[in-house]
Amino acid sequence: MKTVLIIDDSDNMRMTIKELVELNGFSVIGEAGDGKTGIGLYKEFKPDIVTLDVIMREMDGIETLKQIIEFDAGAKVVMVSAMGQELYVKDAIKSGAKGFVVKPFGEQQLMETFKKVL
């Protein structure tokens, strides 16, 4: 079973992503509400894929991504962004993200992105 780490400062978004990925046979090995905690969980568990919110308090998604990639250049990170954040998505792809989904997204969009990344 493929493992997923969810990093998002929104409890509701973490819950939504968790439900979607578990319905599709993935195992959520960790959830983090901030980048620093997410990086620690990544280093501890080395999940198959990470969903990472672009805009978060304290440490944003781009900085979190850079630190994950610095630790593991092969990390498979899917950025989660809101409409109008396309500039951040370009930065994320340049920084090593393997994919992105735009909120609001559905199960099919998330799973298609996972399939491409994995």
Language-model features: where?
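The feature encodes the CheY-like receiver
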Residues: 57, 85
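Two-component/phosphorelay signaling modules centered on CheY-like receiver
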Residues: 11-30
